[in-house]
Protein backbone atom coordinates (compact mmCIF):
# COMPACT_ATOMS: atom_id res chain seq x y z
CA UNK A 1 0.00 0.00 0.00
CA UNK A 2 2.78 2.44 0.94
CA UNK A 3 4.60 1.58 -2.29
CA UNK A 4 1.52 2.46 -4.39
CA UNK A 5 1.21 5.76 -2.54
CA UNK A 6 4.87 6.60 -3.22
CA UNK A 7 4.39 5.80 -6.90
CA UNK A 8 1.31 8.05 -7.05
CA UNK A 9 2.92 10.91 -5.10
CA UNK A 10 4.68 12.53 -8.12
CA UNK A 11 1.42 12.50 -10.07
CA UNK A 12 -0.43 14.08 -7.14
CA UNK A 13 2.25 16.79 -6.89
CA UNK A 14 1.93 17.60 -10.60
CA UNK A 15 -1.85 17.85 -10.28
CA UNK A 16 -1.48 20.06 -7.18
CA UNK A 17 1.06 22.38 -8.82
CA UNK A 18 -1.06 22.57 -11.98
CA UNK A 19 -4.07 23.53 -9.88
CA UNK A 20 -2.19 26.17 -7.86
CA UNK A 21 -0.91 27.90 -10.98
CA UNK A 22 -4.15 27.83 -12.90
CA UNK A 23 -2.64 25.44 -15.40
CA UNK A 24 -0.06 27.99 -16.47
CA UNK A 25 3.12 26.73 -14.88
CA UNK A 26 5.46 28.66 -17.17
CA UNK A 27 3.75 32.01 -16.69
CA UNK A 28 3.38 32.39 -20.46
CA UNK A 29 0.41 34.36 -21.64
CA UNK A 30 -2.49 32.65 -23.34
CA UNK A 31 -3.58 34.28 -26.58
CA UNK A 32 -7.16 35.43 -26.95
CA UNK A 33 -8.96 34.74 -30.21
CA UNK A 34 -10.11 38.32 -30.73
CA UNK A 35 -13.76 37.20 -30.79
CA UNK A 36 -16.47 39.35 -29.25
CA UNK A 37 -16.65 36.72 -26.51
CA UNK A 38 -13.11 37.76 -25.59
CA UNK A 39 -14.14 41.32 -24.68
CA UNK A 40 -12.83 42.34 -21.28
CA UNK A 41 -15.70 42.94 -18.87
CA UNK A 42 -16.14 46.64 -18.22
CA UNK A 43 -16.02 47.97 -14.67
CA UNK A 44 -15.56 51.19 -12.76
CA UNK A 45 -13.17 51.30 -9.83
CA UNK A 46 -11.81 53.99 -7.52
CA UNK A 47 -8.03 54.26 -7.53
CA UNK A 48 -6.14 54.82 -4.28
CA UNK A 49 -5.71 58.42 -5.45
CA UNK A 50 -9.50 58.85 -5.35
CA UNK A 51 -10.01 58.87 -9.12
CA UNK A 52 -12.92 56.89 -10.62
CA UNK A 53 -11.75 55.00 -13.71
CA UNK A 54 -13.54 52.57 -15.97
CA UNK A 55 -11.88 49.97 -18.11
CA UNK A 56 -13.76 51.25 -21.15
CA UNK A 57 -12.34 54.76 -20.68
CA UNK A 58 -8.81 53.44 -20.11
CA UNK A 59 -9.00 51.09 -23.09
CA UNK A 60 -10.44 53.84 -25.27
CA UNK A 61 -7.28 55.92 -24.65
CA UNK A 62 -4.70 53.17 -25.16
CA UNK A 63 -4.09 49.46 -24.55
CA UNK A 64 -4.25 48.51 -20.88
CA UNK A 65 -2.52 46.01 -18.62
CA UNK A 66 -4.85 44.85 -15.85
CA UNK A 67 -2.69 43.29 -13.13
CA UNK A 68 -3.96 41.55 -9.97
CA UNK A 69 -1.61 41.48 -7.00
CA UNK A 70 -1.36 41.53 -3.20
CA UNK A 71 1.09 43.55 -1.13
CA UNK A 72 2.20 40.41 0.73
CA UNK A 73 2.97 38.45 -2.48
CA UNK A 74 6.73 38.03 -3.14
CA UNK A 75 6.13 37.01 -6.77
CA UNK A 76 4.11 40.19 -7.32
CA UNK A 77 6.96 42.27 -5.88
CA UNK A 78 9.41 40.64 -8.32
CA UNK A 79 7.00 41.08 -11.22
CA UNK A 80 6.33 44.73 -10.41
CA UNK A 81 10.05 45.41 -9.91
CA UNK A 82 10.55 44.22 -13.50
CA UNK A 83 7.66 46.46 -14.62
CA UNK A 84 9.22 49.42 -12.77
CA UNK A 85 12.36 49.12 -14.89
CA UNK A 86 10.52 49.00 -18.23
CA UNK A 87 7.10 50.68 -17.97
CA UNK A 88 8.21 54.34 -17.84
CA UNK A 89 9.33 54.06 -21.47
CA UNK A 90 5.80 53.02 -22.51
CA UNK A 91 3.62 54.90 -20.00
CA UNK A 92 2.41 57.32 -22.69
CA UNK A 93 1.35 54.39 -24.92
CA UNK A 94 0.03 51.75 -22.47
CA UNK A 95 -2.11 52.07 -19.31
CA UNK A 96 -1.25 49.92 -16.28
CA UNK A 97 -3.88 49.31 -13.61
CA UNK A 98 -2.86 47.19 -10.61
CA UNK A 99 -5.82 45.86 -8.61
CA UNK A 100 -5.18 44.42 -5.15
CA UNK A 101 -7.04 41.14 -4.81
CA UNK A 102 -6.90 40.99 -0.99
CA UNK A 103 -10.03 42.63 0.46
CA UNK A 104 -8.27 42.83 3.84
CA UNK A 105 -5.76 45.38 2.58
CA UNK A 106 -6.57 49.06 2.97
CA UNK A 107 -5.94 51.85 0.49
CA UNK A 108 -3.26 53.17 2.89
CA UNK A 109 -1.44 49.80 2.77
CA UNK A 110 -1.62 49.79 -1.02
CA UNK A 111 -0.37 53.39 -1.22
CA UNK A 112 2.53 52.52 1.08
CA UNK A 113 3.34 49.51 -1.11
CA UNK A 114 3.32 51.64 -4.27
CA UNK A 115 5.66 54.14 -2.65
CA UNK A 116 7.96 51.44 -1.21
CA UNK A 117 8.12 49.69 -4.60
CA UNK A 118 8.68 53.05 -6.34
CA UNK A 119 5.93 52.58 -8.92
CA UNK A 120 4.86 56.07 -10.01
CA UNK A 121 2.68 56.29 -13.09
CA UNK A 122 0.92 53.01 -12.33
CA UNK A 123 -2.68 53.28 -11.14
CA UNK A 124 -3.48 51.18 -8.05
CA UNK A 125 -6.89 50.21 -6.74
CA UNK A 126 -8.22 48.18 -3.83
CA UNK A 127 -10.00 44.87 -4.30
CA UNK A 128 -13.51 44.95 -5.68
CA UNK A 129 -15.34 41.64 -5.48
CA UNK A 130 -17.30 42.00 -8.74
CA UNK A 131 -14.13 42.81 -10.72
CA UNK A 132 -12.32 39.79 -9.27
CA UNK A 133 -15.31 37.58 -10.13
CA UNK A 134 -15.67 38.99 -13.67
CA UNK A 135 -12.05 38.16 -14.41
CA UNK A 136 -12.04 34.82 -12.57
CA UNK A 137 -9.11 35.97 -10.45
CA UNK A 138 -7.90 33.32 -8.05
CA UNK A 139 -4.14 33.81 -8.10
CA UNK A 140 -1.81 36.74 -7.57
CA UNK A 141 0.17 37.79 -10.66
CA UNK A 142 -2.92 37.30 -12.83
CA UNK A 143 -2.67 39.68 -15.73
CA UNK A 144 -4.81 40.67 -18.70
CA UNK A 145 -3.50 42.52 -21.73
CA UNK A 146 -6.39 44.48 -23.21
CA UNK A 147 -6.53 46.27 -26.56
CA UNK A 148 -8.06 49.68 -27.24
CA UNK A 149 -11.30 48.01 -28.24
CA UNK A 150 -11.44 46.05 -24.92
CA UNK A 151 -10.50 42.82 -26.70
CA UNK A 152 -8.41 40.58 -24.48
CA UNK A 153 -5.15 40.26 -26.38
CA UNK A 154 -3.50 37.91 -23.87
CA UNK A 155 -3.84 36.77 -20.31
CA UNK A 156 -1.69 34.80 -17.95
CA UNK A 157 -0.59 33.97 -14.44
CA UNK A 158 2.95 33.98 -13.12
CA UNK A 159 5.99 36.17 -13.00
CA UNK A 160 7.45 37.85 -16.08
CA UNK A 161 11.02 39.13 -16.37
CA UNK A 162 11.95 42.63 -17.56
CA UNK A 163 12.85 41.49 -21.09
CA UNK A 164 9.43 39.89 -21.54
CA UNK A 165 7.65 42.95 -20.11
CA UNK A 166 9.62 45.04 -22.62
CA UNK A 167 8.34 42.86 -25.48
CA UNK A 168 4.78 43.02 -24.14
CA UNK A 169 4.78 46.81 -23.76
CA UNK A 170 6.42 47.27 -27.15
CA UNK A 171 3.83 45.03 -28.82
CA UNK A 172 0.91 46.66 -27.00
CA UNK A 173 2.14 50.17 -27.83
CA UNK A 174 1.84 49.33 -31.53
CA UNK A 175 -1.68 47.95 -31.16
What does each model-identified segment do?
Residues 1-44, 166-169, 175:
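N-terminal targeting signals for export/organelle localization
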Residues 43-64:
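A short beta-strand-turn-helix
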Amino acid sequence: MAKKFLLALPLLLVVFIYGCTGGNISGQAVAGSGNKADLAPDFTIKTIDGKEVSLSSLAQEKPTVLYFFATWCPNCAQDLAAVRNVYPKYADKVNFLAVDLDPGESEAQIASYRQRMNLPGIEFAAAKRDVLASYNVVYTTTKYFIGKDRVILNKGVGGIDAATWEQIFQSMSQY
